[in-house]
Amino acid sequence: MNPVRKKALLLSAYDARSHQQWYQMLTDGIKDYEWTVVTLPAHHFFWRARSNGLSFALEHKKQLVAGYDVLVATSMLDLATLRGLVPELATVPALVYFHENQFDYPLRSEELKQRIVNAQFTSIVTALCANRVLFNSDYNRHSFISGAQKFIKQMPDGLSPAIPGDIESKSAVVPVPIKDISVNTEDKAGNTIDLVWAHRWEYDKQPEIFFDALEKLYDMPEFVASGLNVQLHVMGQSFREVPDCFQQAQHNRRHNVKTWGYQSRGDYYRILANSDFVISTALHDFQGLGMIEAIHLGCTPVAPNRVAYPEYIPQQLLYDVSQPQQESTALANKLCHLLCSDEIWSQQTASSGLDVSGYLENQLIARYQAEINAL
């Protein structure tokens, strides 16, 4: 006779693709629970952040009252409102997972900064309401806690300064896992370097820094003398508004571009497995799953010494961003240093300290199960 499995409810209040991949891993990998997944579409961000508790209660009441042993939710959820509207969930122990937080986005306008306040406050209340809070990186946890502290200081009254500490005391860091991908590699000419930039084509990933650094690199005498043939793979999801720098860069480096634009998952992994370097210029990356996947597939990362990158990228592969106006120069210098020195090349490929095996799904699924079991 098979044992009766516990029932787990998983709520994704803003069902982005990365969140889907995360909870698919949970529901496939943790077999001790019978999972029910309920989601809301990933659009109208500010409205979804404000209304999701009510939307869940009105649109999915039958599923929500089916009797659960645990509740697992992404951090967009307005947990306090949901528990008030659906009393059957009020005593179900809840784990909230933060893929990101609303305090550390590089917002472009004062209007957006004002509009994000509701989402920031809701995230504090949700974290306070949860029994357990998980973050995907130390950087994410630290920026959330420090952001909550600043937020509370700015409010007129009614918010205890002890709240961030209370949240931190019931939190832990458990990264989003990657799969153990295996891809065949191809032979190539000895003087060819394949270089990847793969992010969303949006301002917060700073594509203009990458392209400006490339132009500076190509003008450096040491690089010119090396005779290296650098092939570019510029990948990632684009949207209706694409920064102007992409079109200009595609024209300027048309003889070097080997891949341009969004790729299928299979082609994306194949390109990573056959490339040498993966570059980030991101202003914010709460974990950097794409960078971790690229490292796992054999790419050497070059990234800014900020956000989550120092947690898994050795210092010698991070470029300095202490002078923002000089960031593209710092990246160009780092690339030239790595590409043009045989000694450095051999050292960084053989003993750079890169190891992301701890991010593999088979290493992390047991930690997730232990966290859920402990609720």
Go through each PLM region and give its residues:
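Conserved donor-binding/catalytic core segment of Leloir-type glycosyltransferases
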Residues: 175-179, 186-216, 233
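Short hydrophobic beta-strand element within catalytic cores of glycosyltransferases
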Residues: 300-303
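Donor nucleotide-sugar binding/catalytic pocket of nucleotide-sugar-dependent glycosyltransferases
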Residues: 131-184
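Aromatic "clamp/platform" in nucleotide-sugar-dependent glycosyltransferases that forms part
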Residues: 283
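A charged, aromatic-enriched C-terminal amphipathic alpha-helix characteristic of glycosyltransferases
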Residues: 47-51, 325-326, 330, 340-375
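Nucleotide-activated donor-binding/catalytic signature segment of Leloir-type glycosyltransferases, i.e.
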Residues: 236, 243-266
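Short alpha-helical donor nucleotide-sugar binding micro-motif in glycosyltransferases
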Residues: 270-275
